[in-house]
Amino acid sequence: GHEPPNVFGQGIAKYFSNALREDALLARCTAGTVVLPGEAGTVQEAFQGVTRLYYERRAGEGGILPPLVLVGRHHWERVLPAWPLVRALAGSRRMAGAVHLVDTVEEACRLVLSRPR
């Protein structure tokens, strides 16, 4: 995707692939992840998070998985139907309770903020 120029991106991070940078950020994202509608790069980043949940590599204290919230039902069910795949992967795994699809950013915020800490 488009990466706006900045000092970090041009001077330091250019030595790392986007996937490595994103994986490092997701590994530290213990309160949850909110994914807004996007295209190829956004889908790839969302599934990096889904993969961490699938293998339970994001469990915090007490083994609680942080939420991953996709915002925009129409987008994630119709435009780029990633939601059915996320639900299929979740199945009866523990991650099923950690993945959510909502319509608004406000709903996403409520989900993330209501998570037990």
Regions found by a protein language model. Give the residues of each.
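Short gly/pro/ser/thr-enriched loop/turn and capping motifs at secondary-structure boundaries
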Residues: 1-2, 42, 75-78
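Acidic/glycine-enriched connector segments
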Residues: 1-35
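Solvent-exposed alpha-helices and their adjacent loops that cap or buttress functional pockets
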Residues: 5-6, 18, 25-28, 56-64, ...
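Thr-Gly-centered strand-to-loop micro-motif
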Residues: 35-37, 71
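Glycine/proline-rich loop-helix segments at beta-alpha junctions forming the active-site rim
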Residues: 36, 53-56
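Short glycine/serine/threonine-rich phosphate/pyrophosphate-binding segments
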Residues: 41-50
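C-terminal functional extensions of proteins
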Residues: 61-117
